[in-house]
Amino acid sequence: MPQSSPSAAATASDMDKNSGSSSSSASSGSSKGQQPPRSASAGPAGESKPKSDGKNSSGSKRYNRKREPSYPKNENFINQSRRSNSQKSKTFNKMPPQRGGGSSKLFSSSFNGGRRDEVAEAQRAEFSPAQFSGPKKINLNHLLNFTFEPRGQAGHFEGSGHGSWGKRNKWGHKPFNKELFLQANCQFVVSEDQDYTVHFADPDTLVNWDFVEQVRICSHEVPSCPICLYPPTAAKITRCGHIFCWACILHYLSLSEKTWSKCPICYSSVHKKDLKSVVATESRQYVVGDTITMQLMKREKGVLVALPKSKWMNVDHPIHLGDEQHSQYSKLLLASKEQVLRRVVQEEKAALERQLAEEKHTPESCFIEAAIQELKAREEALSGLAESRGEVPGVVAALEQRVLMAPLAKESVFQPRKGVLEYLSAFDEDATEVCSLGPPHPVALPLVEEEETVSEPEPEGLSEACEDLELVEDNLGEGTICTESSQQEPVSKPSVTHLSSSPCYYFYQAEDGQHMFLHPVNVRCLVREYGSLEQSPEKISATVVEISGYSMSEDMRQRHRYLSHLPLTCEFSICELALQPPLVSKETLEIFSDDIEKRKRQRQKKAREERRRERRIEMEENKKQGKYPEVHIPLENLQQFPAFNSYTCSSDSALGSTSTEGRGALSLSPLSRSPGSQADFLLTPLSPTASQGSPSFCVGSLEEDSPFPSFAQMLRVGKAKADVWPKTAPKKDENTLGPPAPVDSDGESDNSDRVPVPSFQNSFSQAIEAAFMKLDTPVTSDPLSEEKGGKKRKKQKQKLLFSTSVVHTK
């Protein structure tokens, strides 16, 4: 390699300050011929710029390593080990390359396959991120299993949780509107001096917040104030739907210098003038197994108010606050100024006065007095004493509302002139196509009447088509059916084929007014039994089998046309009941038994999946805390893990059979037995009567007192009980004279070939104990055996191969 001139070296050093990594490496190589070029394994060439600077500034090249970034120690060790031996010269900076930067990561992933970064990331993710500082802006989305999804695609989390349905949900892409949700799930008491025609024609039209006098909420539990954590006193609700005590929210708003403040819960803007009176009523929360009572509801097509059939009236005008029978079925309740003063203002005034008397000497009393002053101003405005001050905002709001709702108001004005034709054509397209196959009907009748009367000329074709439609709806787990779909069963009930031609929907709803409706399987059973829902009982009571919750959307409204009066985002549930023969006959239940059993299997499968999912989540959470599941080793194999009870029972059965065949009786004196049979006999378990009469028997006492004895206990117990065994043997003979074959615990006799399953108390230690006791019995029973025959006893002694007893000194 030729040597370069000093001028060339100076030129190269000047170029190093402005050039990239390639020129710096070339200049360093040309100025120092002893040093080979940097290897590619040490890192990218684009990071060698600080090394050339260190070469030119010889005074600071020793302190350049202090500027190295704070990386994990293991990663620095890996980087240092990969350096080549040629880099150990003094002219090179020992600072490791920055592997966390963008250029180095691209280089390593492109030239080295990304394996080194993967190893480093795996080692860093294996430990807690608090142990390493690491480079900034690390993407940890892979740890959360989180990926961004394009806005145009539908997720699987919308609606009721069904993925296939969520893709078809068109409304689910709209952003969540708190005010829309509040107005869809609450009831409003509004002033009667406004026009609400649009709201009674379109369920999704929002009510002007300035017209609201009181909000009524039906919940399963009484709400509490988030500030004082007590049931709210003179409760006020914000536009975002959160409830506070009046004094608490005034105290919170006074802490801000602005005229508004953020909501303590959702951080929405809260203005003092937007606070409305609220009343929360607690309703029963039904669960599976409860008995629920549902009543038959009736709703005209095109009308947004559904009333019980027993309390039916023609809803020509909105329902007022004083109508107690129908007030719970309407979203809007019109109230006069006198009713607002009596039902709203006076109640809040009494509550504030009680609170002031209790907290008169507390710092909160000033805010209670401020609430009372605002309540007096409202009372004056309602009573007409301050019309010039109080009515101007209301008039302005009314004008704005009318300007915004002018197009919808025009449609609502022309809608009654067209009857119900235009409203129903959007929801009943399928039914009209089926009806168009029949003979023509008079033009004077509206389209709805054609749907009601078409079942008379063609009951068969329509019933088959509607049954298929109902089956599809049932398989999807959606909704129930209405009048026109419930009149397809006149074949089985010819006496009720002539039905009313009124364009109405009939459905079952909870008696207390909750949005709980009957499942289509139960509806078909009632239609089969009574001919139609119109002829069904007004009230039914049954046990809840399943409750499915939904939220109203455009797709749900298309499927359940009878629920089109519910606004969007309104929460409702569909209940499946267990109908019994007093309500429906056994023949009807047999007809729909397949559908009922199918749904039962689906519920069981869903419950199993939920349990598995809960166990899996619990195991994952325990693993995060260092708790791992225990290892379960099965010990059910009797060949590898023999049980002592099974062996003794089999030997006892063999002994009983041979003794019965030879001598004709099971009980004999121990003197007439052979030594081997006597030892086997003493180890057999006692009968139930014998075990109760003699609890001091050796085997029984061992199983009860010490299920897992030690080796020393085996020897000690065996020696202590050895002298007692011959005395207890006659008791067994006396007790076993009655039954010829004792019955085992599982209900089978000992003479059967089947070996009973050993109990959980048996263990391997008991089998070892029995073996040692069997070896000790011939030695302890020498006096008895010598009376029978001394020669035979001597031969028995010679068979003893091993003994652990230290007492055998005779």
From Swiss-Prot:
Q: Where is the composition biased (Basic and acidic residues)?
A: 607-623, 722-735
- Segment forming the signal sequence: none
Please state where this protein is localized: Cytoplasm; Nucleus
Show the GO MF annotations: transcription cis-regulatory region binding; ubiquitin protein ligase activity; zinc ion binding
Q: Which domain of life is it from?
A: Eukaryota
One Gene Ontology biological process: ribosome-associated ubiquitin-dependent protein catabolic process
Q: What's its catalytic activity?
A: S-ubiquitinyl-[E2 ubiquitin-conjugating enzyme]-L-cysteine + [acceptor protein]-L-lysine = [E2 ubiquitin-conjugating enzyme]-L-cysteine + N(6)-ubiquitinyl-[acceptor protein]-L-lysine
Q: In which pathway does it act?
A: Protein modification; protein ubiquitination
Q: Name the principal localization, coarsely classed.
A: cytoplasm
**The UniProt record lists the keyword Zinc-finger:** yes
Q: Where is the composition biased (Polar residues)?
A: 76-92, 652-661, 801-810
One term under GO cellular component: cytoplasm
CDD domains linked to this entry: RING-HC_RNF10 (cd16536)
* Interaction with MEOX2 as annotated region, ranges: 101-185
- Does the keyword NADP feature in the UniProt annotation? no
Taken from the record, one Pfam family name reads zf-C3HC4
Q: Where is this region: Disordered?
A: 1-119, 598-623, 652-674, 722-759, 775-810
What is the protein's name according to its record? Answer: E3 ubiquitin-protein ligase RNF10
Which species is the source of this protein?
Answer: Bos taurus (Bovine)
